[in-house]
């Protein structure tokens, strides 16, 4: 199977897993056009997986259904997803094109957000980003941290497939928080070179994220110290460290911060 991220909008990725015969699993098609263009080159949509209800992740589905009306769709229980689809949730598993994916509930960004795990791949939508995490629109910091900790416990060789290309803007904030992290410094240099070459910085290994993403390192002394300095007091617990990081980033002066 070939894993390919298809760019959409300004910074979204539509993830595709393509079999040798062209049949493909599609994750979060916010736009139809990238899929239609890939179809002209041999891609055959076989199933759609949706992580959450936001338009930039599901907006292309109606047009794709016009072309492939029997295409199966798997998505969370959420009345805001106005489609005919298979409702799935925590503990479910999917077997598509010979691949098995576990479904886990990862609330925080939205109440019903799902993540798909299998075959050393992690399709995490807007929960975990390269060097960052999603904004907390509907959940709580406690929920979001718990979701991230579940993902952090996966095998380190897992490849993280996020919904957006945010690595460079996330790196700026991460380095502001953790400036002496040499692995993080190296990642920013690598990501900058990749983006200059118009290459995606994803997927990225979970091992790399564990070493460089401040939102996965809330127990690390350097991250704890940085949030204490920002708060001008000692954080109460790890949840407050995380909540402080998220609020801090929300107000960090860089364009296109997620």
Swiss-Prot record:
Pathway: Secondary metabolite metabolism; methylglyoxal degradation; (R)-lactate from methylglyoxal: step 2/2
Cofactor note: Binds 2 Zn(2+) ions per subunit.
Keyword Zinc: yes
Cofactor(s) named in the record: Zn(2+)
Record's keyword terms, sorted: Hydrolase, Metal-binding, Zinc
Catalytic reaction equation(s): an S-(2-hydroxyacyl)glutathione + H2O = a 2-hydroxy carboxylate + glutathione + H(+)
A single BP term in Gene Ontology: methylglyoxal catabolic process to D-lactate via S-lactoyl-glutathione
Domain of life: Bacteria
Listed GO MF terms: hydroxyacylglutathione hydrolase activity; metal ion binding
Classification via Gene3D superfamilies: Ribonuclease Z/Hydroxyacylglutathione hydrolase-like (3.60.15.10)
Chain residues that bind Zn(2+) 1: 52, 54, 109, 126
Record: residues binding Zn(2+) 2: 56-57, 126, 164
Family as reported in the entry's similarity comment: Belongs to the metallo-beta-lactamase superfamily. Glyoxalase II family.
Biological function: Thiolesterase that catalyzes the hydrolysis of S-D-lactoyl-glutathione to form glutathione and D-lactic acid.
Name of the protein in question: Hydroxyacylglutathione hydrolase
Name of the gene this protein is made from: gloB
